[in-house]
Regions:
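Acidic, polar-rich low-complexity tracts and alpha-helical solenoid repeat scaffolds
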Residues: 2-6, 17-227
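Bacterial N-terminal signal peptides
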Residues: 8-14
Length: 227
C-alpha cells in the first residue's frame, strides 16, 4: 500500500515536466506508467493518458488493472472527440467484461460516441443506424439505468435524422416532377415509407402534405394523358 502511494505521488510529480513525460514513454516500470496515466486522465490531459494506456492495455491484460485501464482508454478517446475509436474501445470493453464494473457506462458511451459522430442528414446514415442499435442495446441491458431517458432522447433525435433524409429525398422527387419518369410516384412511396417506419415523427405533417401534393400532380397528368 505504501509503495503504491509513493508511486502515485511520483507519477503526479512527473506531470509537471514535458521532458519527464518523454522519459516516462520509454520507461518499463508499467505500474509507474499506469499511475501516471491515471493522473493525466484526472487532469484532463487525455492525449497523454490515451498514449500511455494504449500501450498498457496489452501489458496489463489479466491483471486487476486491465478492466479500468481499458475503460479509461475509451474515455480518453471520447474526451478528445475521437468518437469512432472511443466507441470501438467501449465495445471491446463490454464484450470482454460483460459484467464488469464499468459495463453500464461503457455501453452508454459506446452509443453516445456513435451518436455524436453521426453525419448531417443528407449524407450516408450507416453510422446513425449503428448508433441506434448500440443505444437500444444499452436500454435492453440496463432498463433501470439513470441514463435511460438520455439514451431514449438520442434515439429519437437519430430517428428524426433518418426521417429528415427521407423528407429531403421526397422533396427532390416532387421537385423533379415528371422529368425522366414519374418522380411524383417516387415521392409518394418515399414519404409513405417514412411515415410507416416513424409514425410519431415531428415531420409527419410535412410528409403527409407531400403525399397529397404529389398525388394531386399525378392525377392532373393522368387526366391530361387521357385527352
Amino acid at each position: 500500500m505504501k509503495k503504491n502511494i509513493i508511486i502515485t505521488l511520483l507519477a503526479a510529480a512527473t506531470l509537471t515536466s514535458c521532458g519527464e513525460y518523454n522519459k516516462l514513454l520509454k520507461s518499463t516500470d508499467y505500474e509507474y506508467k499506469y499511475e501516471a496515466a491515471k493522473n493525466y486522465f484526472a487532469k484532463g490531459q487525455y492525449n497523454r493518458s490515451a498514449t500511455l494506456l494504449n500501450e498498457l492495455i496489452t501489458i496489463l491484460k489479466g491483471t486487476d488493472k486491465a478492466e479500468e485501464s481499458l475503460y479509461m482508454l475509451g474515455m480518453s478517446y471520447y474526451n478528445q472527440k475521437d468518437y469512432q475509436t472511443a466507441a470501438q474501445t467501449f465495445i471491446t470493453y463490454f464484450n470482454t467484461y460483460p459484467r464488469g464494473t464499468f459495463t453500464e457506462l461503457a455501453r452508454f458511451h459506446a452509443g453516445k460516441a456513435l451518436f455524436l459522430d453521426t453525419p448531417e442528414p443528407r449524407l450516408d446514415q450507416s453510422s446513425t443506424y449503428q448508433a441506434i442499435q448500440q443505444l437500444q442495446m444499452f436500454m435492453e441491458y440496463f432498463p433501470n439505468s439513470t441514463k435511460k431517458q438520455e439514451a431514449q432522447d438520442m434515439i429519437f433525435a437519430l430517428q428524426d435524422k433518418l426521417v429528415l433524409k427521407e423528407l429531403y429525398s421526397a422533396r427532390l422527387y416532387y421537385n423533379l416532377g415528371n422529368y425522366l419518369g414519374n418522380n411524383y410516384e417516387s415521392c409518394v412511396i418515399t414519404a409513405q415509407n417514412a411515415l410507416k417506419d416513424y409514425p410519431y415523427t415531428d415531420y409527419r405533417e410535412e410528409l403527409s402534405i407531400l403525399v397529397l401534393r404529389a398525388r394531386h400532380e399525378m392525377a392532373i397528368y393522368s387526366v391530361e394523358d387521357k385527352k
